[in-house]
């Protein structure tokens, strides 16, 4: 058994461009925040190790580009994911409306029993908020998916979002899945990244 961790979970952040996926990842992995917006090109990832119920869990969190032109690259990353976090911007009605489309992408590309979490980001922008918490919560409940509102800027619920996801995956896997059980499926495909070098600047 690898002494460094008991579990390795691969998580995926998806959602429209500009909803704050990269900011959530930066806040959780590095506890930093930046106001400057640089759109993710293709796929990026960070790793953070957490403790949960006395177990060490290594989270490999993949941040995907929201733009349509990267969809063929990012879709290949759904396959090995244990958990997928769908992010929308509480100040952007369109990003919330598109959640259904993102959920369809999960159904199309991810494994059948993948864990899902719905996150409404930018909750600090209270005066600009257009997506009601109750509406989103009812929608998430109808799907049986956990829901949280977060703010990467002031760190509200960011830790909780990733910890919730890790706990849900661990619960689904059960005690017998530690270490060896899931790891063979976690070989990361390097091939899908190659199209990114094909001139989409």
Curated annotation (Swiss-Prot):
The lineage of its organism: Eukaryota, Metazoa, Chordata, Craniata, Vertebrata. A motif (Switch 1) lies at residues 30-45. Rab-1B binds GTP and GDP and possesses intrinsic GTPase activity. CDD domains: Rab1_Ypt1 (cd01869). Regulated by guanine nucleotide exchange factors (GEFs) which promote the exchange of bound GDP for free GTP. Regulated by GTPase activating proteins (GAPs) including TBC1D20 which increases the GTP hydrolysis activity. Inhibited by GDP dissociation inhibitors (GDIs). Keywords: Acetylation, Autophagy, Cytoplasm, GTP-binding, Hydrolase, Lipoprotein, Magnesium, Membrane, Metal-binding, Methylation, Nucleotide-binding, Phosphoprotein, Prenylation, Protein transport, Transport. One of its GO terms (molecular function) is G protein activity. GO terms for cellular component: endoplasmic reticulum-Golgi intermediate compartment; Golgi apparatus; mitochondrion; perinuclear region of cytoplasm; phagophore assembly site membrane. It comes from the Eukaryota. GO terms for biological process: autophagy; endoplasmic reticulum to Golgi vesicle-mediated transport; Golgi organization; positive regulation of glycoprotein metabolic process; protein transport; regulation of autophagosome assembly; virion assembly. This is Ras-related protein Rab-1B. It holds the Pfam family Ras. Its cofactor is Mg(2+). The modification N-acetylmethionine is found at residue 1. It catalyses: GTP + H2O = GDP + phosphate + H(+). The keyword Ubl conjugation does not apply. Its main location: cytoplasm. A motif (Switch 2) lies at residues 65-80. InterPro entries: P-loop_NTPase, Rab, Small_GTP-bd, Small_GTPase. A lipid is attached at residues 200-201 (S-geranylgeranyl cysteine). It is a lipid-anchor. Belongs to the small GTPase superfamily. Rab family. Residues 174-201 are annotated as: Disordered. It comes from Mus musculus (Mouse). Prenylated; by GGTase II, only after interaction of the substrate with Rab escort protein 1 (REP1). Residues 64-83 are annotated as: Switch 2 region. The keyword Lipoprotein applies. NCBIfam families: small_GTP (TIGR00231).
């Amino acid at each position: 058994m690898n002494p460094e961790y008991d579990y390795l979970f691969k998580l995926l952040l998806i959602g429209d461009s500009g909803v704050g996926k990269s900011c959530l990842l930066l806040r959780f992995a590095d506890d930093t925040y930046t106001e400057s917006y640089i759109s993710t090109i293709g796929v990026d990832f960070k790793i953070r190790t957490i403790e949960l119920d006395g177990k060490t869990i290594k989270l490999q969190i993949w941040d995907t580009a929201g733009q349509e032109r990267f969809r063929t690259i990012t879709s290949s990353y759904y396959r090995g994911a244990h958990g997928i976090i769908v992010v929308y911007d509480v100040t952007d009605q369109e990003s919330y409306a598109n959640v259904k489309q993102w959920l369809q992408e999960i159904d199309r590309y991810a494994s059948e029993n993948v864990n899902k979490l719905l996150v409404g980001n930018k909750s600090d922008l209270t005066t600009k908020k257009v997506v009601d918490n109750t509406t989103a919560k009812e929608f998430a409940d109808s799907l049986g998916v956990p829901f949280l509102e977060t703010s990467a800027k002031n760190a509200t619920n960011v830790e909780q979002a990733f910890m919730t996801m890790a706990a849900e995956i661990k619960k689904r896997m059960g005690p017998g899945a530690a270490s060896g059980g899931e790891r063979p499926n976690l070989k990361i495909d390097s091939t899908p990244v190659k199209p990114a070098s094909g001139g989409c600047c």
